[in-house]
Regions:
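Acidic, aliphatic-rich amphipathic alpha-helical segments
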Residues: 10-110, 163-164, 169-181
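C-terminal interaction segments
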Residues: 1-20, 122-181
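Glycine/small-residue-rich hydrophobic helix-like segments
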Residues: 96-135
């Protein structure tokens, strides 16, 4: 089965027209599961092969979040929390470590590795911290906002000599590029 990261990369390359039939099929499957007509599978077939159902649903949600960001549609708080957690999980799986901590209160925090040599943090407040609100993180993680724009506009607070390396780790899913932005 494909990892969350592999599925995310494939979805990043898809257009909304490519994803619509798959989303429709997934919604039908979810409806069948919720009405009890068939047992819920642990894995589903995706465009890139089999994946865990929960991972696939989370990435489908991320695609919906990206469409909302591109359209300027306000998202419910619960959706923002889930989207932040999912994107932070992918970021942690891709760049996990103990040098930089990215905080997105109240949704999540993730510890990341420096792209250069950096201190290995174990307890207490780490020396390299970046913190943003959920909207800013979603925009950064999906490519609708660059790191430099976020810094210039005071939308992210940072401390430590390695925290600027986060710019190299973002976006997690470049949906803005796919939307022509």
């Amino acid at each position: 089965a494909h990892t969350l990261i592999e599925v995310a990369r494939q979805i990043e390359e898809d257009s909304p027209e490519d994803l619509l039939p798959q989303a429709s099929s997934l919604l039908s499957t979810v409806e069948e599961r919720l009405t009890g007509t068939r047992p819920t599978p642990a894995r589903v077939e995706t465009l890139v092969g089999p994946a865990r159902l929960t991972d696939h649903l989370r990435l489908t949600m991320i695609d919906g979040v990206c469409m909302a960001l591109a359209s300027g549609i306000a998202l419910p708080r619960a959706v923002k929390v889930d989207a932040c957690r999912t994107l932070a999980t992918i970021l942690g799986q891709t760049h996990g470590g103990r040098t930089i901590e990215l905080r997105v209160p109240p949704a999540t925090a993730v510890q990341l590795e420096s792209t250069t040599a950096g201190p290995d943090h174990h307890r207490g407040t780490p020396p390299n911290v970046a913190e943003s609100d959920m909207e800013t993180f979603l925009a950064l993680a999906t490519g609708f906002l660059s790191w430099s724009q976020a810094r210039e506009n005071g939308r992210i607070s940072t401390s430590g000599s390695h925290v600027e390396e986060l710019a190299e780790m973002l976006p997690v899913v470049d949906a803005a590029h796919r939307c022509g932005r």
